[in-house]
Regions:
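Hydrophobic-cavity lipid-handling domains and compact docking modules
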Residues: 51-113
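Intrinsically disordered, low-complexity segments used for protein-protein interactions
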Residues: 2-6, 109-119, 188-191, 195
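Long, compositionally biased interface segments
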Residues: 155-196
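Intrinsically disordered, low-complexity regions enriched in Ser/Pro/Gly/Gln/His and often acidic
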Residues: 14, 48-51, 104, 163, ...
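N-terminal "first-domain core" detector
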Residues: 1-73
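An exposed acidic His-Trp-rich patch
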Residues: 91-165
């Protein structure tokens, strides 16, 4: 049980992410647009909406509402849409973060990927971010991969304590498997290990 307790503890710690993460996420989305995978206007459409003590961050449409951003020119998906949603307290505490991609492969089969850090507000949910049966089967920070986000078995793969920026980098590295979107090239990893 100790590894699962430790994992949950690290998931709680990432909620204290610096407020600068929103600018870094925007930079990753701009890089996606610059590579021709989404509309260039995305640079100004990932923004927060004030909700009193909170800000809701998402990719916004022309009318200001949340949208799933269409993606283009992906080698393994014929169609895809990306969504990013976050709830941040004015103190900087990250209450919730979700990034998802839903689309179709060239053969018409559906495909989805999502990373979730559930809302931890106990006023919103008595158990906060403790969902499911436990920290193993439903780790606080987890990902889904499958034909959609609902088809059983609804597998939740536990993720290490990654910041919102690192989660965005991971998702983009799955969508655009190129050097430009790989934040930890093996040559860099080996060099970092050698320096230790």
């Amino acid at each position: 049980m100790i590894p699962w307790v430790n994992l949950y503890s690290t998931h709680r710690q990432i909620r204290a992410a610096a407020l600068t993460w929103t600018g870094e996420v925007r930079k990753r989305l701009v890089a996606l647009a610059d590579a021709g995978h989404c509309d260039a206007s995305i640079r100004g459409r990932f923004r927060g909406k004030n909700r009193g003590d909170f800000a809701e961050w998402s990719i916004r449409g022309v009318n200001g509402g949340e949208i799933a951003e269409p993606l283009n020119n992906l080698t393994t998906l014929a169609t895809a849409r990306i969504t990013i949603l976050a709830l941040v307290h004015n103190s900087g505490h990250l209450h919730a973060f979700t990034m998802s991609v839903e689309g179709e492969r060239p053969d018409g089969s559906k495909w989805a990927l999502a990373v979730h850090l559930p809302d931890d507000r106990v006023a919103h949910n008595e158990d906060g971010d403790r969902q499911g049966l436990g920290g193993c089967s439903h780790a606080a920070l987890h990902c889904h991969v499958g034909p959609d986000l609902e088809t059983a078995p609804n597998v939740r793969v536990p993720l290490p304590a990654l910041s919102p920026v690192e989660l965005v980098e991971w998702v983009l590295s799955q969508l655009v498997p190129t050097d430009a979107f790989e934040p930890a090239k093996w040559s860099d990893v080996v060099a970092a290990l050698t320096r230790r």
